[in-house]
Amino acid sequence: MSVNWYCGNAVEDGRERRGWIFGHFIDPSEGVRSSKDVEVKWGIHPVGDKRPEWTADDQRTTLVLLVQGSFRIDLTETSVTLDKQGDYAAWGPGIDHSWEAITDSVVITVRWPSSPA
């Protein structure tokens, strides 16, 4: 039986999964972090780090919350730059995106539901 609580460190726990610490891709034996409902990422992005390719027809809702730095998100509808700690952007199903770290940045990404892309 898996444990229904967990305490950890996002940097350490996400190291093997590009920062992702919750989601369907976590083995159920690891307990509460295995979820089909939500995905959570602690993203550490050095200046110039980017996702040059656009997502394609993602059917999840996404929230990106800036912890530090400056981080640009390009959406099919617009582009936004998160500059101030606590700035965030959210978009729903069908909005494609790419991103770039304008300065060294840390962001928290939350997506739901958690499903293979």
Where are these predicted regions, by residue range?
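Short histidine-centered beta-strand/loop micro-motifs
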Residues: 31-34, 51-58, 75, 81, ...
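A short hydrophobic beta-strand segment most commonly corresponding to one strand
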Residues: 43, 88-90, 103-117
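Short acidic-glycine-tyrosine-enriched beta hairpin
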Residues: 77-94
